[in-house]
Amino acid sequence: MSENNTSRKTRTGSVVSDRMEKSVVVRVERKVRHKLYGKFMKTSVKYLADDPENQCNIGDVVLIEECRPLSKRKRWRVKTILEQAV
């Protein structure tokens, strides 16, 4: 009856913290235009993401995708590591 829709939200960001077991904090930055003045400003949001193999390190650029709630604050999962930190 209903098709299985697999399109999920994805975000690209950098890993800020990896001190938790099987979890990382990913900062996603975006540019927002000010309504009145038109200047572009950087805003960022931190997401808690699941990292089951503990592969991510601080400074890695990762692709995260939305998933079912895994804990109180975790709703994202690391899909791929796009760029390793040196």
UniProtKB/Swiss-Prot annotation:
Pfam families: Ribosomal_S17. One of its GO terms (cellular component) is cytosolic small ribosomal subunit. PROSITE patterns: RIBOSOMAL_S17 (PS00056). It comes from the Bacteria. Keywords: Ribonucleoprotein, Ribosomal protein, RNA-binding, rRNA-binding. One of its GO terms (molecular function) is structural constituent of ribosome. Transmembrane segments: none annotated. Signal peptide: none annotated. Gene3D superfamilies: Nucleic acid-binding proteins. One of its GO terms (biological process) is translation. Belongs to the universal ribosomal protein uS17 family. One of the primary rRNA binding proteins, it binds specifically to the 5'-end of 16S ribosomal RNA. Part of the 30S ribosomal subunit. HAMAP family: Ribosomal_uS17_B. PANTHER family: 40S RIBOSOMAL PROTEIN S11 FAMILY MEMBER, SMALL RIBOSOMAL SUBUNIT PROTEIN US17M. This is Small ribosomal subunit protein uS17. It comes from Desulfotalea psychrophila (strain LSv54 / DSM 12343). The gene is rpsQ.
